[in-house]
């Protein structure tokens, strides 16, 4: 059997950058907000290097914390909470996802109603929704 790997196989540049960022900052006081990527092997390797995962900033009790935002991004309130606690913030969000955050915020500010269609609990969708800042916005969809 012959196996051919496409020239573009592997992680996309946004994920690759997020992993490199986590490795760069790995250590005793390093946390990621959620899984930096969806890959258990990589997450295990980062954990062995001292990177801890949290689902909520309130889980961190470390005045020297460095918090890395996952490649999928996070809502504005997460960034605000990290800054309010005085933690060092490292944003490893994929640039394409950051662009979506800016677009959502721009159109929300212009008074548009933003509808996000996707897997409602996926971290990327949750993060995008977190830039709407309006209670009538809804995440719609299933896996």
Please name every model-derived segment:
Residues 1-4:
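Extreme N-terminal starter segment of soluble prokaryotic enzymes
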Residues 30-36, 116-118:
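Short internal beta-strands
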Residues 34-51:
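N-terminal beta-loop-helix "entrance" segment that forms/cooperates
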Residues 76-78, 98-101, 122-127:
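Short, well-ordered, mixed-charge alpha-helical segments that flank or form enzyme active sites
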């Amino acid at each position: 059997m012959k196996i051919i790997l496409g020239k573009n196989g592997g992680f996309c540049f946004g994920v690759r950058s997020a992993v490199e960022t986590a490795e760069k900052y790995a250590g005793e006081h390093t946390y990621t907000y959620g899984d930096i990527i969806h890959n258990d092997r990589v997450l295990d390797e980062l954990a062995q290097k001292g990177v801890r995962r949290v689902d909520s900033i309130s889980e961190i009790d470390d005045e020297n914390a460095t918090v890395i935002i996952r490649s999928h991004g996070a809502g504005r309130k997460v960034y605000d909470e990290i800054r309010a606690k005085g933690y060092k913030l490292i944003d490893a969000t994929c640039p394409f996802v950051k662009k979506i955050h800016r677009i959502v915020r721009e159109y929300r500010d212009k008074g548009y109603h933003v509808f996000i269609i996707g897997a409602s609990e996926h971290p990327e969708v949750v993060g995008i929704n977190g830039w709407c800042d309006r209670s009538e916005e809804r995440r719609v969809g299933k896996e």
